Amino acid sequence: MAMALTIPRYTVADLERFPDDGQRYELLDGLLLVTPSPGVGHQLVATRLASALTGALESHPGIHVVGPGVVVREPRTQLQPDVMVFRAEGPLTASWKELRETWLAVEVLSPGSRVYDRDFKRDAYLALGVPEVWLVDLRERAVLISRTGAPPDQRVTGLLRWDSPHLDRPIELDLNRIFADLALGKGEVNGKTTGRHR
């Protein structure tokens, strides 16, 4: 007689007790996904995007750019976008749990997380109330934009114009500069998923 497979379900409190071992631990409705440390190309693009967003938004008080960020919805969901834009008035809290105005989540697609980011996290962010999600495709040197109430994965190359309803004016990002001098190694373009369930 076959035995039923039991998949462990975790809480945000459980996740806080996990080791700080260089891997990324995330929860989606209690399901745990572990992905390895990202490659150089992934980190370079994420850093450039965070820097470009910070520069473009510096005249907007109360808007912050971090990378990586954390989106928490207790008790069983905690996701870590590579770059996150959020609004917070006054002194910043030390707890991600208290942030509720996340305006943008950015995921840089990499072999260890490509399928998970594209097929699960994108929709999870939107369902959690994040109004816009960018998936950054290193292979195509493009950004796939998904917004609440709009068709997903609108492909943008060259110049990205972010016309968020939260901003008093659009901002523009030069994607050619973001992807400049990017020579991806085989491990960063083969699209294999290496994340594993604990």
Where are these regions (language model features)?
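Gly/Pro/Ser/Thr-rich low-complexity, intrinsically disordered segments predominantly at protein N-termini
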Residues: 1-198
